[in-house]
Amino acid sequence: NQGTSVVENLIIIPNSDEVTSINLNIDKSIYLGNALICKNTNIKYTATATYPVRVQSKEASIIIDRCTISGLLFGSGFAMPEVKDEASIGYFGMTDTNIKVENTGTNLYLVTNMNCNELRFENNIVYYSGVPEATSNVENFKVFQGPSYSVNKLTLTSNTFIDIESGYSNGKTSAIVYPSKIGDITVNKNIYYFTYREYPAFLIRVASAEKSKVTIAENNYAYLFETGLTLNVFQNKIGDTSVGFTSNDVDLYDTTDPATFNKSTGTFIPKEGYTQYGAQR
């Protein structure tokens, strides 16, 4: 519970053989001055409003590694600027982490409305733990939301998204990463999977496509469920690059086998032939 006091550096890492993980319950926003680093930490947000992290500085660093995250709220998310245009992120790295979304709603953003020099989102699982249907599903989820803000370098690799919609109501299409531009894009070995889907869905969308560059975009897999809705890696053409999923019609999981597809444990292991894609656990 930090209240409105500024924390310059918050570092949470187990440092003994006896303690292999730490439970971090956040019931008020952390006003971040410089760096947040969490490793092997079970992060649970227990407040009833706003974001867990409010960034107050330019070029702040956020590093989340081998963690679990739960309790994030719709209408907010994980990190936001305390004052618009007076905060930015130098490095945002989330790796080997599970994000469990237990409720349904619209607009859940991990990072919103800040420039980000480098965004690395790698080997993570993001999943809705319930059973999606027309009246209850996860809509407009974003790793990065900021069509007026830029990401200079994006690495989006080896992630698994389960029943997480990037689109939302009224036919509005969007993407899991949506900045104004991305200077350099690597998007590789991701799995985007639905047991139910209502809207078109994409991994990446940019507001200024001509100012973005694709370095690697390959080996991304998706499954559409039983719909004809569009699902693509890029919502719009980026430079001369228009890339779809390597496959979007192969059912990648045996959803009847709790040893390989289990929302209660966060276990998602693809069928043989596809185990090298998505998050590795």
Predicted regions and their residues:
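Right-handed parallel beta-helix
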Residues: 4-15, 20, 33-45, 58-72, ...
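Acidic/proline-rich low-complexity IDRs
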Residues: 9, 23, 118, 153-155, ...
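Structural detector of coil-to-beta-strand junctions
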Residues: 23-29, 49-54, 61, 75-82, ...
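Non-transmembrane, interaction-prone segments in cytosolic or luminal domains
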Residues: 34, 77-79, 92-97, 167-169, ...
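Acidic, glycine- and Ser/Thr-rich low-complexity intrinsically disordered tracts
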Residues: 207-281
